[in-house]
Curated annotation (Swiss-Prot):
UniProt region (Disordered), positions on chain: 421-444
Assigned protein family: Belongs to the tubulin family.
Xref: InterPro entries: Beta-tubulin_BS (IPR013838), Beta_tubulin (IPR002453), Tub_FtsZ_C (IPR008280), Tubulin (IPR000217), Tubulin/FtsZ-like_C (IPR037103), Tubulin/FtsZ_2-layer-sand-dom (IPR018316), Tubulin/FtsZ_GTPase_sf (IPR036525), Tubulin_C (IPR023123)
Official protein name in the record: Tubulin beta 8B
UniProt remark on domains: The MREI motif is common among all beta-tubulin isoforms and may be critical for tubulin autoregulation.
UniProt lineage: Eukaryota, Metazoa, Chordata, Craniata, Vertebrata
PROSITE patterns the record matches: TUBULIN, TUBULIN_B_AUTOREG
Purpose of the protein: Tubulin is the major constituent of microtubules, a cylinder consisting of laterally associated linear protofilaments composed of alpha- and beta-tubulin heterodimers. Microtubules grow by the addition of GTP-tubulin dimers to the microtubule end, where a stabilizing cap forms. Below the cap, tubulin dimers are in GDP-bound state, owing to GTPase activity of alpha-tubulin.
Assembly: Dimer of alpha and beta chains. A typical microtubule is a hollow water-filled tube with an outer diameter of 25 nm and an inner diameter of 15 nM. Alpha-beta heterodimers associate head-to-tail to form protofilaments running lengthwise along the microtubule wall with the beta-tubulin subunit facing the microtubule plus end conferring a structural polarity. Microtubules usually have 13 protofilaments but different protofilament numbers can be found in some organisms and specialized cells.
Protein's organism: Homo sapiens
Any one biological process term the GO annotation gives: mitotic cell cycle
Residues recorded as bearing Phosphoserine in the entry: S172
Residues modified as 5-glutamyl polyglutamate: E436
Length: 444
């Protein structure tokens, strides 16, 4: 089977991870003790993608939980699904990274890395046919960003031919927790460009907007935000876990979504958006799903897809629906909005359909777009980075842990290169449109 090992790093990564395991366990009818209580053979058929069977018929998540301070671990442990995880797979330090990328990467985090890699190896060895690794982390803090990227490079060294897929929570301009976020994020993106295969860029600002605008929640909590992220995460792996008419897996996604190796930063979306614990009253049609899915308000990254063009798109539908209708709708969207799709990739939309919908919905769709507008996120971080770095503000916290200023300069220029690469393909599409219009005028 095609197993996936999930590594959750830092406070943010662990909270998202814990929520994700709740969602997955619910879909496969596994209770908080790891026991199966379902009535469908489909739930058990491929349960070993995310779980392995322990003694006594208990199903244990293939999860590695890492943090440099014990607080989050304790709350996951005492949370609703805390007893499901293997106790050996909780690895925590004592002193925390203090929002410092250098601590997570070079000092505190580096000391823990070997014991984390031992657990990762153990999990990988218990797989029949390991598909790849998923990592949840935030880029604004110290552990998720510094130690998270360190683990990615270690995993890449040991498993060079396996897919590494990250769910990275980027700092957003309006919702800021820490002053040094731009430093941590830039240093992390520098690593992700080189070592990850697929990065799903999610940011809190977009999630807050979805909660207040679409779900009409007066005071959204992190629990509500994590609910949205976990819905997307579950959608991405759904084809591996349940049978479907058109399957996708992490590798197929990468092959269809990444036109050039560095451009692997995706904006995810989900439709229909529902708040925690609510039921949907009306079944959506495939047309409405497709419409919602491409709507800028449904994107989980705070950048407007209409400002860029889609290089590639993947759409994963869930629920019973006629394939023909799905194909028609996807064609219509591309046909009506052809200016938003790069026309030098002929068929740049990958579709997958899985028959089993998520709990409480008749059908749903997960959207993954590789859009040049994602550069807005990086540009915003880059501007803040430059403003601080020009004055060398807060730099002593990093150099004190053994970092060199040169690393900052390298990371900055690598991220700026990424922005200009996206811009270049954006411009290529715009130029082609102008040429076509010019040619039409000449003919006329």
């Amino acid at each position: 089977m095609r197993e996936i090992v999930l590594t959750q790093t830092g406070q943010c990564g662990n909270q998202i991870g814990a929520k994700f395991w709740e969602v997955i366990s619910d879909e496969h009818a596994i209770d908080s003790a790891g026991t199966y209580h379902g009535d469908s053979h489909l739930q058990l058929e491929r349960i070993n993608v995310h779980h392995h069977e322990a003694s006594g018929g208990r199903y244990v998540p293939r999860a590695v939980l890492v943090d440099l301070e014990p607080g989050t671990m304790d709350s996951v442990h005492s949370g609703p699904f805390g007893q499901v995880f293997r106790p050996d797979n909780f690895i925590s330090g004592q002193c925390g990274a203090g929002n410092n990328w250098a601590k997570g990467r070079y000092t505190e985090g580096a000391e823990l890395t070997e014991s984390v890699m031992d657990v990762v190896r153990k999990e990988a060895e218990s797989c029949d046919c390991l598909q790849g690794f998923q990592l949840t982390h935030s880029l604004g803090g110290g552990t998720g960003s510094g130690m998270g990227t360190l683990l990615i490079s270690k995993i890449r060294e040991e498993y060079p031919d396996r897919i590494i897929n990250t769910f990275s929570i980027l700092p957003s301009p309006k919702v800021s927790d820490t002053v040094v976020e731009p430093y941590n994020a830039t240093l992390s993106v520098h690593q992700l460009i080189e070592n990850a295969d697929e990065t799903f860029c999610i940011d809190n600002e977009a999630l807050y907007d979805i909660c207040s605008r679409t779900l009409k929640l007066p005071t959204p909590t992190y629990g509500d935000l994590n609910h949205l992220v976990s819905a997307t995460m579950s959608g991405v792996t759904t084809c591996l876990r349940f049978p479907g008419q058109l399957n996708a897996d992490l590798r197929k996604l990468a092959v269809n979504m990444v036109p050039f190796p560095r451009l692997h930063f995706f904006m995810p979306g989900f439709a229909p958006l529902t708040s925690r614990g609510s039921q949907q009253y009306r079944a959506l049609t495939v047309a409405e799903l497709t419409q919602q899915m491409f709507d800028a308000k449904n994107m989980m990254a705070a950048c407007d897809p209409r400002h860029g063009c889609y290089l590639t798109v993947a759409a994963i539908f869930r629920g019973r629906m006629p394939m023909r209708e799905v194909d028609e709708q996807m064609f219509n969207i591309q046909d009506k909005n052809s200016s938003y799709f790069a026309d030098w990739f002929p068929d740049n939309v990958k579709t997958a359909v899985c028959d089993i919908p998520p709990r409480g919905l008749k059908m749903s769709a997960t959207f993954i777009g590789n859009n040049a507008a994602i550069q807005e996120l990086f540009t915003c971080v880059s501007e803040q980075f430059t403003a601080m770095f020009r004055r060398k503000a807060f730099l002593h916290w990093y150099t004190g842990e053994g970092m060199d200023e040169m690393e900052f300069t390298e990371a900055e220029s690598n991220m700026n290169d990424l922005v200009s690469e996206y811009q270049q393909y954006q411009d290529a599409t715009a130029e082609e449109e102008e040429d076509e219009e010019y040619a039409e005028e000449e003919v006329a």
